[in-house]
Amino acid sequence: MKTLKIPVLITLLLTGCGSNQVTSTSSNYSSSKNSSSTTSSNQIISSSIELEKVDLELPVFIGTQSGFQIDRNIYGTFIEHIDTCIYNGIWSEMIMDRKFHDPVATGVSQWSKNGDVENNQEVYKSAPYATTINKDGSITQLGIPLDENKDYDGYFYASGNGNLTISFTNADETIERKIEINSDTMTKYEYKIHSNVKNRKTKIIIKSDSNGIVVDSLSLMPSENYYGMRKDSLDLLKSLNAPFYRWPGGNFVSGYDWKDGIGDRDERQSKRNLEYCGLESDFENEDERLANDIIKIGSLGFYGAFEPNDYGLDEFIMMCRYLNAEPNIVVNSGLGNALDAQDEVEYCNTTNTEYGNKRVEKEPYNVKYWSIGNEMNGSWQLGNVPINEYIVRHNEFYSKMKEVDNTIKIIGVGDNHSNWSKDMLNNTEMDYISEHFYAERDEKDSITHIRSLQKQAEYRIDNHRKLNKPNVYMSIDEYAYMNAECSSRLKDGMGVALCLNEFIKNADVVKIGCYSSTVNATQGSLTTDKYGAHMQGNGYALKLYSDSMLDYYQPITFQRSKLKDEVFEIIGTTNIGKDKLAIAVVNSGEKKIRLTNDKFKKIESRKYVTADFLDDYDDDEYSKFRYYEENNPSSIVVEPRSITTFVIQL
């Protein structure tokens, strides 16, 4: 996978400014070498002793600092086993259906066969099937995206006596590895390959020269990975700087057994995805199977036919460590039960217990935040029951989980659009109550579109205040645009920024926020293709706020009548000493605007993202976003069509 581009640092010495120095950094935050920023993203930001020319000088006024500290967890995010968020997004496995969930060449299997190939249910590792390849028989899978000058690590388990030839072939090259199999029991065989060319349509062919060679649990990953995760995705997520990650769902969790996702990955059984069972489609014929692309079918298709369980609880914890983020685990209160949830807390947070001893590491994970269920108010949710029954269920989960670790923080299922939240708060115990909202898109009116998430946030927060439960805080752990395409545009990022403004303004009640979702799926903060990862509009918004915003809400006002025909919003935050101010500005219009205030002593930094059009987004061919970081700018200038943060000394 491609290494994240490191922005080039350009230093400008300002003539006549003595020791003052301005540094500017530009980047498009894309790890694909196909992506190249537009010419202007590589230009030096203009700085000189004379103030930059602008379209409008706008005085701003600083209000009174709020007394409620902003919880950084409001800049959190959410990953779910849905679409290509995990598999082909975060996870680096390149072989689909590597554990033969369906018999080869049947159902949703991504394997075709040639010659004498049998499906073997006497499996070693990953039920329900292994595959027996007899003399001159072979199995094939298409769509392996090999990259230029890249190394890959592969392995498989096999038994029998003979030779297997593994070929990777495309229009440009063929790579072969001949491996002798000489074992009556299933044994792991490893190999390495090096690709000289870039070809997304490489096919893997596994052929036997003898009868009775049984194969199971194949794998191929780039040599550069982090515990099986895509390094390009993780490095981009690290730059996102989200402090809080929610997992594994989402609707997915209500049909998920966490115990399926621990232990040796090759022994974890592939399971039918219960939440989305039936949404997969079989292939009409072999030609259709062979014609399909890796990203469009099977477990990597929308929602997915099955869950390979390669990415589980331990992998999630490893990812959070890499990202220096707080993990939030959602337990299954749909088809799951309180004892399984109790076991999960025991696995994560205890030693010398039944499940603590099953943990990969001796030291406990000490997971603090636990959610009991997801959207259990909804008829679409597996295990949905009326509120009076769910109250009993929640209380049982709460009691069993707290028996293991009384220090954990519990997030309960809420919905204050109905009476659900009221009934939950009056009859259960929890530390936070969850709220989800998905705003309608308006493709005809950009201003309405940008403000729609903000309006949803205002509505939900106002409803929560009316419930008058001051000791239970809001966890807005899913929010996004409804029915959105994968790539998030600049205007979607602006909508996320305005939503974050509401979280900041209401820091006394909103303590957790999780944008949905992090990778791909519903307008992911970043998107991936076969060769790279790309930061998108809402990702830039989250990054800017997480990187720059300070501890307390500081109201900023201005004469709004000067900016009537666009979205122009300013929000301020200060540190506890009140000597530093961080402001975020959303400007959907075409004016370049300078903000002025006599209290502004020194501008420490300006960071912003912009594009030529509000509908721009990044893809694998062209990077349309332009992201800049600038130290010690000469004035507070807001570019057209931008999301900007400034840190200012007062």
Task: Please report, for each region that a protein language model flagged, where it lies by residue.
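C-terminal motif of bacterial Sec signal peptides marking the signal peptidase cleavage site
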Residues: 15-16
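Extracellular and organelle-lumenal recognition/adhesion modules and their flexible linkers in secreted
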Residues: 42-309, 326-328, 342, 388, ...
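Aromatic/acidic polysaccharide-binding cleft in carbohydrate-active enzymes
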Residues: 81-82, 472-549, 553-571
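An active-site-proximal structural segment forming one wall of the substrate-binding cleft
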Residues: 196, 202, 222-242, 309, ...
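Noncatalytic carbohydrate-binding groove/subsite architecture in carbohydrate-active enzymes
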Residues: 202-209, 347-348, 383-500, 532, ...
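Active-site groove signature of glycoside hydrolases
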Residues: 208, 248-249, 354-385, 437, ...
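Carbohydrate-binding surface patches
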Residues: 565-600, 647
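C-terminal beta-strand-rich structural cap/linker in extracellular carbohydrate-active enzymes
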Residues: 624-650
